[in-house]
Amino acid sequence: MRQYHNLMKEVLAKGVQKSDRTGTGTISVFGHQMRFNLADGFPMVTTKKLHMKSIVYELLWFLKGSTDNNWLKERGVSIWNEWAAPDGDLGPIYGYQWRSWPAPNGQHIDQISEVVETIKKNPDSRRIIVSAWNVADIPRMALAPCHAFFQFYVADGKLSCQLYQRSADIFLGVPFNIASYALLTHMVAQQCNLEVGDFIWTGGDCHLYSNHLEQVDLQLSRDFLPLPKLNILRKPDSLFDYEFEDFEIVGYESHPHIKAPVAI
């Protein structure tokens, strides 16, 4: 994933030092885009090991509409532990906004279901969009949405997806987010009888935390390995019926994991 390495290099070369909410400090650039042709392989970084189990379970959790961290903990996924309340509640974060966006009439909007139906019935629509950025609900969220807005696009029988990530923790978060939305694109494409096209990642505040710079240097020193392939082993009745066991990553070889602190 040369595109990802190029982003880290750009931030190191051109970034400005900024303070941040966590008090850690960052080097940051504003505005960057990466494009991945999903037919070329599944975009998992190979210059450090990614925890695919967490990626899959978190996406399934979002699609369930859940905001209860206990569901993840029961499956051995700890990525939301630092932000969860003692009872596991995370407030109206991604899953709630995706599946139950509150409407003025007191009802709720299932954005994901609407997107799938629009792709099937009106694939040329320019409104195939899901937003997690609900301004009214942000004060009640454990963490404001970083990957805030995504749009699907259909052309030549292929489904593409573009994500806007307003805040991008390049070393820890971005590889995870790329793999998650690439997986979602594969799933939606299967449900809509389409092939996969491109995944486009667009970042706003793209930053490296000051306590990740040694890890970044180590990762940039490593050689790329071939991208793996994603196999989806069955086609469920709906997008909401996938199970963890339905996904197989074939041929994923990577350099060792690089540990880095999470900025909270």
From Swiss-Prot:
Under Pfam families, the record lists: Thymidylat_synt
Instruction: List the active-site residues.
Output: C146 (nucleophile)
Q: Does the keyword Transferase apply?
A: yes
Q: Which residues bind (6R)-5,10-methylene-5,6,7,8-tetrahydrofolate?
A: H51, D169, A263
Enumerate the GO terms in the molecular function aspect.
Answer: thymidylate synthase activity
What is the top EC class of this enzyme, as a single word? transferase
Q: Name one GO cellular component term.
A: cytosol
- What processes in GO biological process is this protein linked to? dTMP biosynthetic process; dTTP biosynthetic process; methylation
Q: Which InterPro entries match?
A: Thymidate_synth/dCMP_Mease, Thymidate_synth/dCMP_Mease_dom, Thymidate_synth/dCMP_Mease_sf, Thymidylate_synthase, Thymidylate_synthase_AS
> Which of this chain's residues are annotated to bind dUMP?
R21, R126, R127, R166, S167, A168, D169, N177, H207, L208, Y209
Transferase keyword on record: yes
List its EC numbers.
Answer: 2.1.1.45
The protein's annotated catalytic reaction(s) are: dUMP + (6R)-5,10-methylene-5,6,7,8-tetrahydrofolate = 7,8-dihydrofolate + dTMP
Q: Where in the cell is it found?
A: Cytoplasm
- Which keywords label this protein? Cytoplasm, Methyltransferase, Nucleotide biosynthesis, Transferase
Which pathway is recorded for this entry?
A: Pyrimidine metabolism; dTTP biosynthesis
Q: How does it assemble?
A: Homodimer.
As for what it does, the entry says: Catalyzes the reductive methylation of 2'-deoxyuridine-5'-monophosphate (dUMP) to 2'-deoxythymidine-5'-monophosphate (dTMP) while utilizing 5,10-methylenetetrahydrofolate (mTHF) as the methyl donor and reductant in the reaction, yielding dihydrofolate (DHF) as a by-product. This enzymatic reaction provides an intracellular de novo source of dTMP, an essential precursor for DNA biosynthesis.
User: Which PANTHER family does its entry note?
Assistant: THYMIDYLATE SYNTHASE, THYMIDYLATE SYNTHASE 1
Family, similarity comment: Belongs to the thymidylate synthase family. Bacterial-type ThyA subfamily.
Per its record, how is this protein called by name?
Answer: Thymidylate synthase
Native organism is Polynucleobacter asymbioticus (strain DSM 18221 / CIP 109841 / QLW-P1DMWA-1)
Encoding gene (name)? thyA
